[in-house]
């Protein structure tokens, strides 16, 4: 009887320990550019989608936003921003990797050829896995470019396609924010979709006092919309340890 009682106690302690481990916070690191980064809400109405992502998770998931404006896979690696993430990341943490906007740039410090872009992503994926972390690839959000009431988006070129193909070939989770944001902008149309992006009148934003007609960066409405897309996709794909903590209003 004593052995049975001890066994029951041991099992109970093990179950409690497992519950406590499951309740530990899982980190999601975000590596990307200005469309994801966090902004000072006292200075600008511009928002990054990752800035809004915490609103879609409960207290067991922590969002660590390391996205930075103007960065491509090339400059993010060169400036050792990726190394900083790898130095902090723990086993079972996630890292969402979303680049492309600045890789397509003609600026030499940013531009990455298609081959280099692919190799840079592979490097990031391998290094994350080496830390027993969980990489997720995300395509860039669509650049809201209309002509004759039709959406045309050729500025991102083949970078979203490369991201998509790489995720498939390496069996890495993909969040196709390019496709989802494109479909949304098409459904909304030219004028209504401006409310998602930094189309603002003069006097609204202290950083852009003369107003803005920006088809790349997001206002709060757009950032919340993209963040919800990301969280919904995480839940739909049932990603381990974080899917059950998604909150969709």
PLM regions and their residue ranges:
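Short, basic, glycine/proline-bearing loop/turn elements
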Residues: 33, 66-70, 109-110, 146
């Amino acid at each position: 009887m004593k052995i049975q009682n001890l066994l029951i106690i041991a099992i109970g302690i093990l179950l409690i320990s497992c519950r406590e481990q499951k309740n530990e916070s899982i980190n999601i690191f975000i590596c990307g550019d200005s469309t994801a980064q966090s902004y000072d809400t006292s200075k600008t109405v511009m928002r990054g989608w990752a800035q809004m992502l915490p609103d879609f998770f409960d207290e067991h998931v922590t969002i660590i936003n390391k996205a930075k404006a103007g960065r491509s896979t090339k400059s993010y690696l060169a400036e050792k921003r990726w190394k900083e993430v790898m130095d902090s990341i723990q086993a079972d943490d996630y890292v969402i990797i979303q680049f492309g906007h600045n890789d397509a740039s003609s600026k030499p410090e940013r531009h990455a050829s298609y081959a280099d872009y692919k190799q840079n992503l592979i490097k990031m994926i391998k290094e994350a896995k080496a830390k027993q972390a969980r990489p997720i690839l995300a395509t860039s959000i669509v650049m809201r470019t209309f002509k004759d009431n039709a959406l045309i988006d050729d500025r991102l070129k083949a970078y979203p396609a490369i991201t998509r193909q790489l995720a498939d070939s390496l069996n890495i989770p993909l969040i196709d924010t390019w496709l989802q944001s494109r479909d949304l902008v098409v459904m909304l149309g030219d004028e209504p979709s401006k409310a998602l992006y930094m189309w603002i009148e003069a006097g609204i934003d202290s950083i852009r006092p003369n107003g803005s007609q920006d088809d790349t960066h997001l206002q709060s409405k757009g950032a919340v919309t993209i963040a919800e897309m990301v969280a919904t996709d995480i839940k739909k794909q049932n990603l381990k340890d974080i899917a059950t903590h998604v909150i969709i209003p």
